[in-house]
Amino acid sequence: MINFQLIDGEALLARLQPTLGGIKGKLTPNMDMQKVTWFRTGGLAELFYQPADEVDLAFFLQNLPESIPVTIVGIGSNLLVRDGGIPGVVIRLSAKGFGQVQQVSPTGFLVGAATADKHLAAAALEAEIAGFHFYHGIPGGLGGALKMNAGANGVETAARVVEVYALDRRGQCHTLSLADMHYSYRHCAVPEDFIFTAALLEGKPGNKGDIRAAMDEVALHRESVQPVREKTGGSTFRNPKDISAWRVIDEAGCRGLQIGGAQMSEMHCNFMINTGQATAYDLEALGETVRARVFAYSSHLLQWEIQRIGQFEQGRIVSSFDPFN
């Protein structure tokens, strides 16, 4: 049985004010998450917090009762917020407090977790540091890239990481080495409550002409094969071993498949798009339908790459496809 929690941000804010009155960041009750995610759909965040800086975030976490659930979101490019909203506190780092790109060595940067990937690529271009061009084609922020080991054009975030800096749910600081991140394909194995705040990244010497050419190639490829002007969350599913997700989706007849306002893109069928008025229910139901059809056709069990968070709207629950249960 699924329990549904009433979203009442005003009441939660009033409850927390006595202990959190000293924060400098912004607290917004009942935040419409449609304004945050690239799908432009989904429910409310009960209390939405944007910390002013790392000190502010640590103070907030240290004084937030442990009974209050915390959800971390980034730029929202690969995020689906369910229609029933997100109980508790949603934390999103702002570019103002966590968007620095500081060159700290001839080929190294200290980068805030709220930095847009494309801005990191641009900074590396100006500094003539190679190895960051692939970020020009990733529509997200560094925090999400660190979490998911984001990559493109054969390069992954793990190839650039030296150290990652994080706060845990209690507001304690942690420094993680590359080995501590335990990276694998689109995954890192660190505690779920860690909030990445920054990372030390290392590239290699380069020249502006070659770097710009590599970035242009990334942009041209992305424009030619991905529905970049649609309301989408990027790649819907991780690639199975030894084959592309789009190929098994296409072979199963799911290119263009539609449920409500949600559709698997005709241009790139591993991209799910909101054609106009899709609900989160439509999008998740479409994804699970694709998973079932692909498994029935080819026995490939697709795993979601898009992050799905929050609670379902009462009476509109999407069951996760499980062929073994």
Swiss-Prot record:
Cofactor(s) required, per the database record: FAD
Reaction catalysed by this enzyme: UDP-N-acetyl-alpha-D-muramate + NADP(+) = UDP-N-acetyl-3-O-(1-carboxyvinyl)-alpha-D-glucosamine + NADPH + H(+)
Single Gene Ontology MF annotation: UDP-N-acetylmuramate dehydrogenase activity
SUPFAM superfamilies: FAD-binding/transporter-associated domain-like (SSF56176), Uridine diphospho-N-Acetylenolpyruvylglucosamine reductase, MurB, C-terminal domain (SSF56194)
Principal EC category: oxidoreductase
Domain FAD-binding PCMH-type, residue spans: 40-221
UniProt-listed GO biological process terms: cell division; cell wall organization; peptidoglycan biosynthetic process; regulation of cell shape
Cellular localization per UniProt: Cytoplasm
Enzyme active site: 186, 235 (proton donor), 305
EC number in record: 1.3.1.98
InterPro entries registered for this protein in UniProt: FAD-bd_PCMH, FAD-bd_PCMH-like_sf, FAD-bd_PCMH_sub1, FAD-bd_PCMH_sub2, MurB, MurB_C, MurB_C_sf, Oxid_FAD_bind_N
PROSITE patterns from the UniProt entry: FAD_PCMH
GO CC annotation, single: cytosol
Annotated pathway: Cell wall biogenesis; peptidoglycan biosynthesis
Pfam families registered for this protein in UniProt: FAD_binding_4 (PF01565), MurB_C (PF02873)
Keywords associated with the record: Cell cycle, Cell division, Cell shape, Cell wall biogenesis/degradation, Cytoplasm, FAD, Flavoprotein, NADP, Oxidoreductase, Peptidoglycan synthesis
Record-linked NCBIfam families: PRK13905.1
Cross-referenced PANTHER family: UDP-N-ACETYLENOLPYRUVOYLGLUCOSAMINE REDUCTASE
Family of the protein in this entry: Belongs to the MurB family.
The protein's role, per its UniProt record: Cell wall formation.
Name of the protein in question: UDP-N-acetylenolpyruvoylglucosamine reductase
Organism: Bartonella henselae (strain ATCC 49882 / DSM 28221 / CCUG 30454 / Houston 1) (Rochalimaea henselae)
